[in-house]
């Protein structure tokens, strides 16, 4: 099977971790890393690994020729992606947006990836969205969810400048994803940066309100099936306890431990984004090559 060529836009923590994960993919061939800081660790590592390096931003990469990549991962910022999206679309690239910009449709692999493989730009929502929306959707597959609230708690050390500058976009985009993809009638998202030492793992809580008399056994089964699917590409994703029921309210506690490729294991919030991005790209690559997908 031929590999599909990809490039990374953004040489920060997320882009660098993505570079390591892509190096192990049997389907994707990383060719290039694009950034704006020639002294960044990401660009230095990319150069040492033999990839093409562009330190003048997206335009020099696009001017170099179309053959370098069919897929471009954007790991910059929400504001930057709005500009990048237009240029990538005009160049005929499939863009996987790891920022909260949401230019393209929201995608959560366990819920709706198969519906968007013919798009030119898809959005991975946020780390909190990738962690929690599948749980909301699992609950909603059994009983309508009238309200869902998620709380994503991450280590302060895992929140770099990009994360901190995108806080407002994080809460807005995640809440929209809870409703649009999770299926909740009303959604709310909260992010907490915890300065504890040693740094904590990413911890998430989902609160959901369902119909009276909803089938609890079926809800628990749906949650466990969803967790197992996510673990196929994010092994550190796990429940911290069994779902808790209080009349028609459900509380689910879980955590995400990173794989430790480039980022520390406590940076599960970043790891779930890079692992999800690779999963989406591999499914898209199967689609364009014509061998079918697992979706």
From Swiss-Prot:
Sequence positions that bind NAD(+): 11-14, 158-166, 269
An annotated GO BP: catabolic process
Top-level EC class: oxidoreductase
EC numbers, comma separated: 1.2.1.10
Pfam family, any one: AcetDehyd-dimer
Active site positions: 127
Top-level division of the source organism's lineage: Bacteria
Record-level Gene Ontology MF annotations: acetaldehyde dehydrogenase (acetylating) activity; NAD binding
Enzymatic reactions: acetaldehyde + NAD(+) + CoA = acetyl-CoA + NADH + H(+)
Annotated keywords: Aromatic hydrocarbons catabolism, NAD, Oxidoreductase
HAMAP family reported in the protein's UniProt record: Ac_ald_DH_ac
Family membership noted in the UniProt record: Belongs to the acetaldehyde dehydrogenase family.
Protein name: Acetaldehyde dehydrogenase
Lineage: Bacteria, Bacillati, Bacillota, Bacilli, Bacillales
